[in-house]
Regions:
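Flexible, surface-exposed loop/linker segments and immediately adjacent secondary-structure boundaries
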Residues: 2-43, 47-51, 55-203
């Protein structure tokens, strides 16, 4: 059974921790399996070809291969995340969250978001919701982005001559509406574009 279908079936149980593991995935440096507990303060890393779907509190995540994520927060909420490297699709419940990457700080308020973190550039697609973007190396370079359906992806760079050059428009890449629907289902929600008349897309 395909990953998206398996995970969607699990949604009725409101799972927590690791829901699906493909290939080599580590929690705090140790091999992870589906069903493993995951809490704020843990780290998740994937090897080439590895990926994982997991739930922490009201938030759900899909981490792709060659990625490393550090979490922090209370026992029920991962309030602060650091994507050291790699690719992460996330959906968040209400409340403030923060994600840091090598080049950006992203303030989140009830959002679906896709991030690709590299040493010199971060890609951010606010799939829906509201985020505050800030360049790490130039705090005055900032932008608030509000979208309903992948409307305003951005690159945030490590270096730039002016604030306007630190955050620039980007295309929509490497994530799908089906993945967002699957993640939201795990925490008992639907993306706002479901039922809105907007077509589902794969980018």
């Amino acid at each position: 059974m395909p990953l998206l279908q398996r995970v969607a079936l699990a949604a009725g149980k409101r799972p927590s921790g690791m829901v699906d593991v493909k290939g080599e995935v580590l929690i705090n440096g140790r091999p992870a399996r589906a069903g493993a507990a995951l809490k704020p303060g843990d780290s998740v890393a994937t090897a080439p070809g590895g990926s994982a779907v997991f739930v922490v509190g009201r938030d759900a995540f899909l981490i792709r291969e060659k990625s490393e994520l550090l979490t922090a927060g209370s026992s029920a909420l991962a309030g602060s995340l650091r994507l050291v490297t790699g690719k992460l699709l996330s959906v968040f419940g209400r409340g403030a969250r923060r994600i840091a990457t090598p080049t950006a700080t992203i303030g989140i308020r009830g959002t679906g978001i896709y991030i690709e973190a590299e040493a010199e550039r971060t890609y951010v697609c606010t799939c829906y919701g509201l985020v505050d973007l800030q360049a790490s190396n130039m705090p005055e370079a900032r932008e608030t982005v509000s979208t309903t359906h992948h409307d305003a992806p951005r690159y945030i760079y490590a270096h730039g001559e002016t604030p306007i050059k630190m955050i620039e428009p980007a295309p929509v890449v490497n994530h799908t509406d089906a993945e967002l629907i699957m993640l939201e289902a795990l925490v008992g929600r639907k993306p706002p574009f479901v039922g809105s008349g907007l077509g589902y897309k794969s980018y």
